[in-house]
């Protein structure tokens, strides 16, 4: 006896393509394809009498219908996948009613829901005038896509199933990656796990925060996303990722991210959470040097005295870049909260940005200050500022004599930067 092997669905896809030209299947496949694309449910029902609903169809190069679908000589596709990719709601519903399996996978391991999200239409209407033809077309496309998603969910599509070769991303991860904002609430209402992790151990909120997509972040948080979940490989939280992106050159130029960071902080993000290198959000913000973000973190009581595992303070990170050093007002604000002032890391190395000749006087001044202990009064002032922060300083004014309050809050350490 020869070797007997079991053929799975992937083998059937290949075999059907090889044998298609040898029989009447070519015409049947072509007609079924065209009926699905036209959403001709009557014809679909007739053709399914002679074609198993979960078996792929293959369109040949000389098929007229092939123009819309194929860029390769032949392509095999399962009928329900075809309807999902092109968001043909009536065809999708017809196929499901005739036994189509929403969990059937293609040769790359993707389910119907995975494929639908991967082909979600980009239909932003912000540039189109409401009511005109373009706006109506885009709105119709979006509505058709949403209808297809609702149909799939209503027929038992698994909303937490991960694609085999899609970096283990759940449908929610795919929706975030491909900008499918309307999808989020539908998936979560149908049981999608908002705290599921992908192959990189990132939750959907990690991804949305990294992209500074506030709408998606709001939806995920509303459905219970953990704002303090840390990526297992790095220790990064959504807050740290949002601060990193917002502090980048692009974030600075676009003025993006402040509202996203505030959203996380107001929903309980731990402002002083440290990653595996010991860095906090304020370390990242200080390195980026974007004043609005630094001020926001300070407003939520970010600790400017936390050291990384390598002994680097937020001030150290700020002084790493010469462009930051030139902003003496922001430097003074950071010094206003800092004690003790630590100018080197664990290896005794000074920040690179302050080593330029033009900063020699400032460098020498800061080094001297770091070696000189503050007076007890100065230490007390800093402790009060760090304990009560910016949010409670007006409240504190009700309990302290005016002269003391002014000495605590109205005198920046400008002598450091003079």
UniProtKB/Swiss-Prot annotation:
Keywords annotated in UniProt? ANK repeat, Repeat
- Which GO cellular component terms are attached? nucleoplasm
ANK repeat placement = 27-57, 75-104, 132-161, 167-196, 200-229, 234-273, 277-306, 310-343
SMART domains with a match to the protein in the record: ANK (SM00248)
* InterPro entries, alphabetized: Ankyrin-SOCS_Box, Ankyrin_rpt, Ankyrin_rpt-contain_sf
UniProt cross-references to PROSITE patterns, sorted A to Z? ANK_REP_REGION, ANK_REPEAT
Q: What is this protein called?
A: Ankyrin repeat domain-containing protein 61
* Originating species: Homo sapiens (Human)
Kindly list the organism's lineage: Eukaryota, Metazoa, Chordata, Craniata, Vertebrata
């Amino acid at each position: 006896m020869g070797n007997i092997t079991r053929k799975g669905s992937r083998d059937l896809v290949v075999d059907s393509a090889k044998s298609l030209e040898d029989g009447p299947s070519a015409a049947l496949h072509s007609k079924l394809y065209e009926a699905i694309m036209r959403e001709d449910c009557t014809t679909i029902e007739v053709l399914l009498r002679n074609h198993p609903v979960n078996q792929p169809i293959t369109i040949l190069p000389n098929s007229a219908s092939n123009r819309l679908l194929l860029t390769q000589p032949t392509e095999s596709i399962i009928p329900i996948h075809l309807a999902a990719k092109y968001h043909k709601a009536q065809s999708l519903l017809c196929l499901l009613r005739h036994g189509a399996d929403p969990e059937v996978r293609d040769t790359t391991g993707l389910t119907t829901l995975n494929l639908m999200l991967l082909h979600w239409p980009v239909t932003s209407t912000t540039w189109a005038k409401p009511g005109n033809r373009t706006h109506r077309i885009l709105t119709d496309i979006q509505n058709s896509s949403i209808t297809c998603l609702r149909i799939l969910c209503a027929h038992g599509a698994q909303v937490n199933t991960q694609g085999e070769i899609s970096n283990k991303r759940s449908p929610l991860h795919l929706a975030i990656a491909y900008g499918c904002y309307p999808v989020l609430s539908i998936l979560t209402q149908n049981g999608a796990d908002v705290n599921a992790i992908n192959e990189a151990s990132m939750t959907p909120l990690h991804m949305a925060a990294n992209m500074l997509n506030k709408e998606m972040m709001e939806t995920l948080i509303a459905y219970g996303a953990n704002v303090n979940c840390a990526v297992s490989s790095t220790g990064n939280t959504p807050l740290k990722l949002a601060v990193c992106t917002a502090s980048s050159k692009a974030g600075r130029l676009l003025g993006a991210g402040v509202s996203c960071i505030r959203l996380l902080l107001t929903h309980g993000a731990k402002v002083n959470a440290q990653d595996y290198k010991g860095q906090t959000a304020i370390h990242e913000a200080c390195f980026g040097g974007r004043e609005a973000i630094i001020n926001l973190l300070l407003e939520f009581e970010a600790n400017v005295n936390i050291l990384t595992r390598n002994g680097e303070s937020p001030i150290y990170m700020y002084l790493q870049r010469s462009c930051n050093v030139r902003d003496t007002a922001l430097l003074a604000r950071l010094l206003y909260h800092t004690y003790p002032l630590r100018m080197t890391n664990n290896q005794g190395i000074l920040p690179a940005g302050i080593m330029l000749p033009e900063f020699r006087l400032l460098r020498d001044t800061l080094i001297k200050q770091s070696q000189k202990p503050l007076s007890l009064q100065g230490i007390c002032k800093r402790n009060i500022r760090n304990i009560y922060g910016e949010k409670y300083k007006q409240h504190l004014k009700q309990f302290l004599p005016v002269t003391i309050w002014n000495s605590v809050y109205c005198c920046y350490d400008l002598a450091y930067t003079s």
